[in-house]
């Protein structure tokens, strides 16, 4: 994930290069176009891909994602596939202070979204809006395996009450998808593209 901080720097966290998952942090100074790798401390998130990150003030908030290790791969190839997938999908929230580069854990009450990756999160006032993603649970309309599916969940995280709740809306909602993009403009959430697994 990549986020603009203060208009002059871009912070990159985590990702996957096709072989390895990462949880490192890099900073690009946009004024001199120079990369640096700051020394971070605190309880850092585990390596992951497909996570979301948003900036709230000077805090970088990271949610969800997906990771796989050798042990999970062995399980997924056998009778423990379901439990292996359960361990791979993430739902934690970590916060990085972009001034001190110290990680901390964040706990939010209410009914949190299912573990997922490929979703989007956007800031709208004091609310964080979450939509879609690829998850291991039931309830979505499109599946390619019994334990995995894209979804059309719309969740709201209130930073005032530090709690999750399911979003309510009228009209025709977007279809289930992951890998899409979204942005909040005023009272509107714009969603574009994505993948249902059956089609883009």
Residue ranges of model-derived segments:
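Kelch-like beta-propeller repeat domains
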Residues: 1-200
């Amino acid at each position: 994930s990549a986020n603009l901080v203060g208009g002059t720097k871009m912070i990159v966290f985590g990702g996957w290069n096709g072989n390895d998952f990462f949880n490192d942090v890099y900073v690009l100074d946009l004024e001199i176009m120079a990369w640096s790798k700051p020394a971070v401390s605190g309880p850092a998130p585990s390596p992951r891909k497909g996570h979301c990150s948003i900036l709230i003030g000077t805090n970088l908030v990271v949610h969800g994602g997906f990771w796989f290790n050798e042990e999970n791969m062995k399980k997924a190839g056998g009778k423990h596939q379901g439990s292996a997938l359960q361990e791979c999908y993430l739902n934690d929230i970590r916060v990085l202070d972009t001034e001190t580069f110290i990680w901390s854990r964040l706990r939010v009450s209410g009914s949190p979204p299912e573990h997922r990756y490929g979703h989007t999160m956007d800031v709208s006032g004091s609310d964080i809006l979450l939509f879609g993603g690829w998850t291991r649970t039931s309830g979505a309309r499109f599946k390619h395996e019994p334990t995995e599916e894209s979804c059309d969940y719309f969740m709201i995280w209130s930073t005032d009450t530090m709690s999750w709740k399911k979003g309510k809306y009228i009209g025709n909602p977007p279809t289930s998808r992951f890998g899409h993009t979204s942005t909040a403009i005023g009272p509107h959430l714009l969603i574009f593209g994505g993948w249902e697994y059956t089609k883009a």
